[in-house]
């Protein structure tokens, strides 16, 4: 059986850990009490989430490494802003933030600039 995982940004995607929901909640509590290593474990435990999101943006002409790094920025922002008081799974909260960071990156690095008013007209048509 062959593995389809690759190394992106120096990270071997085949060896990425996956956190369970209970582990994630425990790490969020530790992070909120000030433990820095808990944040690092949360980031490392959710890198597969970033990988699954960047697959949507594969055919945009951008390097996968760049998309992965930008997705990780969105992941870190979502980890910092996540509230355990809400009854929401972390992945449900994080995916829109990761997508938003990637879209912002793609929009800002696009060589063709389209004004917002023209874009709005195009969406209405």
From Swiss-Prot:
The answer to whether keyword Transcription applies is yes
Name the job this protein performs.
Sigma factors are initiation factors that promote the attachment of RNA polymerase to specific initiation sites and are then released.
State the coiled-coil residue ranges. none
Protein name per Swiss-Prot or TrEMBL: Putative RNA polymerase sigma-G factor
Q: Does the keyword Transcription regulation apply?
A: yes
Q: Which key words tag this protein in UniProt? A: DNA-binding, Sigma factor, Transcription, Transcription regulation
A Pfam entry, by short name:
Sigma70_r2
Annotated GO biological processes are: DNA-templated transcription initiation
Give a GO molecular function annotation for the protein. Answer: DNA binding
Similarity field: Belongs to the sigma-70 factor family.
Give the organism the record lists: Bacillus thuringiensis subsp. kurstaki
């Amino acid at each position: 059986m062959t593995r389809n995982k690759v190394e992106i940004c120096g990270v071997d995607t085949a060896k990425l850990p996956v956190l369970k929901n209970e582990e994630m909640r425990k790490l969020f509590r530790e992070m909120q009490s000030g433990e820095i290593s808990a944040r690092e474990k949360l980031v490392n435990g959710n890198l597969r989430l970033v990988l699954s999101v960047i697959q949507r943006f594969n055919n945009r002409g951008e390097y996968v490494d760049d998309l992965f790094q930008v997705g990780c920025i969105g992941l870190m922002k979502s980890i910092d802003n996540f509230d355990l008081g809400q009854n929401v799974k972390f992945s449900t909260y994080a995916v829109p933030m990761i997508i938003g960071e990637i879209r912002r990156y793609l929009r800002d690095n696009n060589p063709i600039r389209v004004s917002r008013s023209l874009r709005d007209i195009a969406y209405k048509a």
